[in-house]
Amino acid sequence: LIDEGCHGVAVFGSTGQAQLLSVSEKISLLNELTKSKYKDNYLIGTGLNSLNETINFISISKSLGFNNFLIMPPAYYKYGDEDVFNYYSRIINTHQDIKIVLYNFEKLCGYKFSPECVNRLVKNFTSQIVGVKDSSYNLFETLKIDNFSILPGSESKLLKGLELGCSGIITA
């Protein structure tokens, strides 16, 4: 895919059924991916609800040379903007040298990013928060942040997204 012009590949996203894979299965696949010449082009989804497991998984991924992550807020419980801001803050305070694409997918995790929360995260963590995958489709039409990638999560939103200045798409 990358040889054909794709900028990167998301690994362990929702289509890849990340929530159904154990951490050991994910690590096993990451070990295989370390052999790829495209390692810097992989966006590693965490797919974990536990903050500590997410932080530990990022540590392991970093030790294997991966630094770009697709991170969804934890699922199941109802979280507000402050909870989500604190979740990402704790991750970034532990791993300040990573790049994060926020994963906005309310149907899967129960939380939909507000533009205010995204703006606050980017303002506070400009070097780490580099984009958002918008699978809830409430951000790609209105969010405007310099040097920030907005990536709709569906082919049906691609053309309109590109017309509105989106960077591309993350899709199956």
List the model feature ranges, each with a label:
Residues I2-K112, V118, K123, I129:
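Active-site beta->alpha loop and helix N-cap motifs at the rims of alpha/beta catalytic domains
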Residues I92-T94, F105-A172:
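Catalytic alpha/beta core domains of metabolic enzymes, predominantly
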